[in-house]
From Swiss-Prot:
<feature type="region of interest" description="Disordered">
    <location>
        <begin position="1"/>
        <end position="24"/>
    </location>
</feature>
<dbReference type="InterPro" id="IPR018261">
    <property type="entry name" value="Ribosomal_bL27_CS"/>
</dbReference>
<protein>
    <recommendedName>
        <fullName>Large ribosomal subunit protein bL27</fullName>
    </recommendedName>
</protein>
<dbReference type="InterPro" id="IPR001684">
    <property type="entry name" value="Ribosomal_bL27"/>
</dbReference>
<dbReference type="GO" id="GO:0022625">
    <property type="term" value="C:cytosolic large ribosomal subunit"/>
</dbReference>
<dbReference type="GO" id="GO:0003735">
    <property type="term" value="F:structural constituent of ribosome"/>
</dbReference>
<keyword id="KW-0689">Ribosomal protein</keyword>
<dbReference type="Pfam" id="PF01016">
    <property type="entry name" value="Ribosomal_L27"/>
</dbReference>
<dbReference type="GO" id="GO:0006412">
    <property type="term" value="P:translation"/>
</dbReference>
<comment type="similarity">
    <text>Belongs to the bacterial ribosomal protein bL27 family.</text>
</comment>
<keyword id="KW-0687">Ribonucleoprotein</keyword>
């Protein structure tokens, strides 16, 4: 006879690392060229003027300036666009 009780298996016990997604520079903030503005999966926020888009859909500033957000109307859903107004 066994002197130890057999332990059952479990299907839990896994968790992924957080990806730190979200807005990194809010409206009205001053940013420098190359600054990350938004980390996202997919294009929930579209790039506007002076904003580039990386291969992982990260939005970043192309010039120094001030961050602005605007809502744009698309056929099926409203979207947001982020732009950088160049500092003069």
């Amino acid at each position: 006879m066994a002197h130890k009780k057999g332990t059952g298996s479990t299907r839990n016990g896994r968790d992924s690392n957080s990806k730190r997604l979200g807005v990194k520079a809010y409206g009205g903030e001053t940013v420098t060229a190359g600054s990350i503005l938004i980390r996202q999966r997919g294009t929930s926020v579209l790039p506007g003027v002076n904003v580039g888009q990386g291969k992982d859909d990260t939005l970043f500033a192309l010039t120094d300036g001030v961050v602005t957000f605007e809502s744009i109307r698309r056929s099926l859903r409203n979207r947001k666009r982020i732009s950088v107004v160049a500092s003069s």
